[in-house]
């Protein structure tokens, strides 16, 4: 809000949360104190990279066609997450995913809520996304009161009716300032830092590209004015967040919701931050809002992001295929950064062997090599 005056909201990255908890702590056996130390060092490195314009150079090196593809991919990704959260799409061991049971209340209300939200958007109702969430939630409460929606805590079906209004937020004392550099070798520590660094760097750049493209922030050369401030804020948040006890803080993809509803300045990010603080007090109410109630907003925002697909040049396969791979892999790999990996590598290879190597710039080639090494070395 203050460094760059953009509507980009910062929060702990969900994918990085999973990597932090399941890969670093559960699988590799390191303590969360060590993982926080790695996040802290990663943040320091990001501050340095932002100060010397390395992250900005990477952002500017991404081809214009791929920037549009990132926006589309994020839209598909957001919509898929929304459908998955509501159970519209479920895991299937045979086909990976399949359609959920549309006769269940969460799935039915998610689909009904999506139609309601779209009607509100079409009729240009201000705050249509928020209104759609509230209407879907209220419909869920009605279903619970009518006995159609049955609470079963053991099965993960929770009450939609708040049991209180305000509660004191929990203390951060047990986790704040608990960084530790002991219990891990220097080599392993560097590997952990690099893993956090890679995912955070390209998740952040992907989000900035996608949301900026949708908002129309990019100039004629595909560059984002004042990007240095946005990247510095992101890096500083990661560093401070680690000290306070949270995993990597990043520019999160749901920023697209604010942009889709008209947000164009830092006031949007500032308002979101203030509301996050207020939400700490009203957790008894907010925690009862079910995931199926937020599905309509995510699906509609996804639709708005996908609109950029019409601007992608698919006639030239050296441009069209990398854009296609960016979109596809972002969704099927459940990762913004992995979408960029396959998009950039295919872009460089097709330009190189397709007789258009003069269209490559050194930075994108270096990025492609690093991406390739990342795939090989894991």
Residue ranges of model-derived segments:
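Flexible hinge motifs at transmembrane-helix junctions and intramembrane kinks/re-entrant loops
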Residues: 115-171, 197-201, 329-341, 350-363, ...
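Interfacial helix-loop-helix linkers and transmembrane-helix boundary segments
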Residues: 4-9, 32, 54-65, 124-128, ...
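Helix-loop-helix hairpins and the membrane-proximal interhelical loops
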Residues: 98-99, 133-228, 369-373
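Inter-helical loop and helix-membrane interface segments of multi-pass membrane transporters/permeases
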Residues: 22-35, 57-69, 76-119, 145-181
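Generic alpha-helical transmembrane segments of integral inner-membrane proteins
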Residues: 40, 44, 48, 111-119, ...
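Transmembrane alpha-helix interface/packing and boundary motifs in multi-pass membrane proteins
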Residues: 1-9, 119-124, 195-203, 234-244, ...
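Helix-loop-helix junctions within the multi-pass membrane cores of secondary transporters/permeases
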Residues: 2, 13-22, 26-74, 211-308
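Transmembrane alpha-helical segments and their short flanking loops
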Residues: 15-29, 257, 270-378
């Amino acid at each position: 809000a203050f460094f760059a005056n953009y509507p980009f909201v910062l929060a702990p990255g969900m994918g990085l949360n999973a990597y932090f908890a399941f890969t670093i702590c559960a699988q590799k056996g390191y303590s969360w104190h060590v993982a926080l130390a790695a996040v802290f060092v990663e943040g320091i490195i990001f501050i340095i990279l932002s100060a010397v314009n390395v992250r900005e150079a990477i952002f500017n090196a991404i081809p214009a066609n791929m920037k549009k593809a990132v926006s589309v991919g994020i839209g598909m990704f957001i919509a898929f997450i929304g459908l998955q959260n509501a159970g519209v799409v479920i895991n299937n061991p045979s086909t990976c995913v399949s359609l959920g049971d549309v006769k269940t209340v969460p799935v039915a209300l998610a689909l009904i809520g999506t139609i309601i939200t779209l009607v509100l958007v079409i009729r240009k109702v201000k705050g249509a996304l928020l209104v759609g969430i509230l209407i879907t939630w209220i419909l869920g409460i009605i279903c619970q009161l009518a006995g159609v929606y049955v609470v079963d805590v053991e099965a993960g079906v929770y009450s939609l009716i708040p049991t209180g209004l305000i509660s004191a937020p929990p203390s951060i004392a047990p986790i704040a300032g608990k960084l530790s550099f002991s219990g891990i070798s220097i080599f392993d520590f560097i590997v952990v830092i690099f893993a956090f660094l890679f995912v955070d760097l390209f998740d952040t750049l992907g989000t900035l590209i996608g949301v900026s493209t949708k908002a129309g922030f990019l100039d004629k050369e595909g560059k984002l004015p004042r990007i240095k401030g946005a990247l510095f804020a992101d890096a500083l948040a990661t560093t401070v967040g680690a000290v306070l006890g949270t995993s990597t803080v990043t520019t999160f993809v749901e920023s697209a919701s604010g942009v889709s509803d008209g947000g164009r300045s830092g006031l949007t990010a500032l308002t979101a931050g203030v509301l996050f603080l207020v939400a700490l007090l009203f957790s008894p109410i907010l925690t009862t809002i079910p995931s199926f109630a937020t599905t309509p907003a995510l699906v509609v925002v996804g639709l708005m992001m996908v609109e950029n697909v019409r601007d992608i040049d698919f006639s030239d396969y050296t441009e069209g295929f990398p854009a296609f791979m960016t979109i596809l892999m972002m969704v099927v790999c459940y990762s913004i950064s992995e979408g960029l990996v396959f998009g950039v590598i295919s872009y460089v290879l097709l330009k190189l062997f397709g007789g258009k190597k003069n269209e490559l710039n050194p930075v994108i080639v270096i990025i492609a090599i690093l991406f390739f090494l990342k795939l090989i070395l894991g």
